[in-house]
Amino acid sequence: MSEREEVILDTSMGSIHIELYWDHAPRTCKNFYELAKRGYYDGVSFHRIIADFMIQGGDPTGTGRGGTSIYGERFADEINPGLQHTGAGILSMANAGPNTNGSQFFITLAPTPWLDGKHTIFGRVSDGMNVVKRMGLVKTDANDRLFIVQKILYALNAVDLNKEL
């Protein structure tokens, strides 16, 4: 795996290492990678968690309605039929319908085949799945909002981390 393929999300519960699928969703990977590099995700909370489904973050407003991409407000889907939501640890773009990708993303906690063809899959958790699973157990209210805020403390690109060492 190339260093440029990985982003590390250091969260309030621990580190989540993300392998990006550059060959399958290059624009989506570039968006996520660049937003992480620019510090866009630093201090941003996971604003929605649904047990046995997914954890969602990437909205700096924390409302689930905010966030923009590096390409402007929204950009097109990169749906690859060879990639499916087959289990826990799949990284996909959250959206409000076709071609409405911004900065929000989610990580699955279980198979979610009904999302196939509707959300761009652009990576997977390569390390830190225990953190994702623990986060999936956090208590939420009736609107799937967390009682105890869980944040991305900072997001790092593996190549940048290696430069610092």
UniProtKB/Swiss-Prot annotation:
Disulfide bonds: none annotated. Keywords: Isomerase, Rotamase. Its EC number is 5.2.1.8. GO terms for cellular component: catalytic step 2 spliceosome. InterPro entries: Cyclophilin-like_dom_sf, Cyclophilin-type_PPIase, Cyclophilin-type_PPIase_CS, Cyclophilin-type_PPIase_dom, Cyclophilin_A-like. Residues 3-157 form the PPIase cyclophilin-type domain. GO terms for molecular function: peptidyl-prolyl cis-trans isomerase activity. It catalyses: [protein]-peptidylproline (omega=180) = [protein]-peptidylproline (omega=0). PROSITE patterns: CSA_PPIASE_1 (PS00170), CSA_PPIASE_2 (PS50072). GO terms for biological process: protein folding. SUPFAM superfamilies: Cyclophilin-like (SSF50891). Belongs to the cyclophilin-type PPIase family. PPIL1 subfamily. PPIases accelerate the folding of proteins. It catalyzes the cis-trans isomerization of proline imidic peptide bonds in oligopeptides. This is Peptidyl-prolyl cis-trans isomerase-like 1. It comes from Rhizopus delemar (strain RA 99-880 / ATCC MYA-4621 / FGSC 9543 / NRRL 43880).
